[in-house]
Amino acid sequence: MSDLILGIGEYGVSKTPGSMVKTYALGSCVAVTMYEPNLKIAGMVHVALPESKLNTAKGEQCPGYFADLGVPLLFKEMVRLGCHARGRGLVVKMLGGAAVMAGNDTFNIGKRNILAVKKILWKLGMGPVAEDVGANYSRTVSLHVDTGLVNVSCPGRGQWQI
């Protein structure tokens, strides 16, 4: 059993039984999870910023860093592994987008990331079935390949599922 660990700006998909797709310390970043329950395919992207036009060179180098590139790439990878080309049957969830700089989030990056992801999912004909977004705390996210359950944890707040 080998877990797939994603850093900021990374995306990945797993079909490995008994494993998880994980990302740590989501602050203003947003994680989008996609799960196909019949095929047991689990995918996630760890998005840092809403739009690649902010830094096109970075977008070419690390497309998962931006919502407008990373979310469609994750979906494309899910389809490549056998998911329906229109997203039928996919269970999509989103997490993160916190305002971690208490009272000093001038750019509202978390909120902008949340809105950008929702817009992109809408364009792809999907929407999240569950969300754990906003607030002012960091989250660690684990997506279970066998079940599609998403575990969330936060120091001082415990663990929960969405």
From Swiss-Prot:
CDD domains: CheD. Keywords: Chemotaxis, Hydrolase. Belongs to the CheD family. GO terms for molecular function: protein-glutamine glutaminase activity. Probably deamidates glutamine residues to glutamate on methyl-accepting chemotaxis receptors (MCPs), playing an important role in chemotaxis. GO terms for biological process: chemotaxis. Its EC number is 3.5.1.44. This is Probable chemoreceptor glutamine deamidase CheD. It catalyses: L-glutaminyl-[protein] + H2O = L-glutamyl-[protein] + NH4(+).
